[in-house]
Amino acid sequence: MRVKKLFPLISGLALAACAAGPDYRAPAPAALAVPAAWSDGSAAPEADAALAEWWRVYNDPVLDGLVARAVESNLDIAQAVSRLRQARESLRQSQADFLPSVSASGSGGRNFREGAADNSSYSLGADASWEIDLFGGTRRAVEASRADLAAAGYSLANVRAAIIAETVSNYVTARLAQERLRIARDTLKTVEDNYDIARWRVQAGLVSSLDAEQARAQLAQNRASIPSIEQSLAGALNRIAVLTGDAPGAATRALETAAPIPAAPDAITAGIPADTLRQRPDVRQAERVLAAATARIGVAESALYPSLRISGNVGTSALSLGSLGDVITGGLFASIGQLIFDGGATASRVRAQKAAAEGAFASYKASVLGALEDVENALVALRAARERQVQFTEAYDAANTSAILARSQYQAGLTDFRTLLSAEQSLLSARQGLADADADEVFAAAQLYSALGGGWQTMNPIDGWQPE
């Protein structure tokens, strides 16, 4: 009867329960200063499939293989997966607070006393305790943990996208270094020929030794440029090895065979800013961090309100194992607690959590503005790289023609070596500039795809979390 009398009280309190703290609502775009369109007016959305696996637009099987290895074996991604699993376990721990805790115990013993018969005693018992979530503190804790899990998932997605972008960037750096090596070695052969011609003309008495010395200086300068390019190539290959989870060396040996710089797609559409923000994992992570901080205000506030705990126990004891259960005893208890005074510590924790939520909102808005900045910068970089390509293509054509004419005229004795040297330097500068512009276009395209939030949408579910 006593047990039955407790249920109406518990039910009434449960029905009257409410969740402490504010309900979370995602900030409106207007509060985040999100524009309706990009400054260049582009608005057509990029296809989801192209954005999710954007590196495939370069049509480079070697690059595709490197990205696959990085996604599979990169250690930064592995660390992010571990953090996601920790967040999943934290959520499970929070959810467990909804349920009672039950423990059991048992004992047995035998007493010996001289001159008296031995006797034994045995007991079994169980204790249960349940704190009813009257004011939603546990609900808010679960809400916060669920948001933390989503934030950890989007953090993983952000790491994945960043590793893919870095792999592509280092691959292009390696191919650019190989192209610059090819240019340097081609130029070196030409300079060696010029040196031979200059020496012959000096020996023939046609010119002074100044031509030979100028040619020798040009030859040494071109030879000196090669080691720094080789260093750049080695650095890019070593970084690719680490990104793919390997030690530098054999892992990237196949990349030592030169290949052209991959070509960027003709057109990349940016969509509208609001769509980009939904695609950016770092922005979505920041939004979930804000949701978790808001929920924790309720966790802190719930400590200001009364708490209700139900506890009980049941047990049996006997002098023999066979008699256990013959007599069962137990009890059921309810207790209500209310904080009276703690020097303002609990109220201070509420204020601190509100401040944390304000900081999380500022961080979220900063992520939004940073994402918008990334896209705008990438659009400008891509446009500038393509303009440089056009100009360097024209410069290369003109410099190549000029160098051919200068070389033939010098061989015929119609011009001096300084004119030839100037023409050769202009050709080298134009070739290097065109190679840099080609690579810059690919860098800018990769920067734009990354800024638009590409590279994570096809992730497989991990430990119960999957992108929404």
Where are these regions (language model features)?
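A short glycine-centered flexible hinge/capping loop motif at secondary-structure junctions
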Residues: 202-206, 410-414, 451-455
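Terminal intrinsically disordered/low-complexity segments used for targeting and assembly
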Residues: 2-72, 146, 230-278, 284, ...
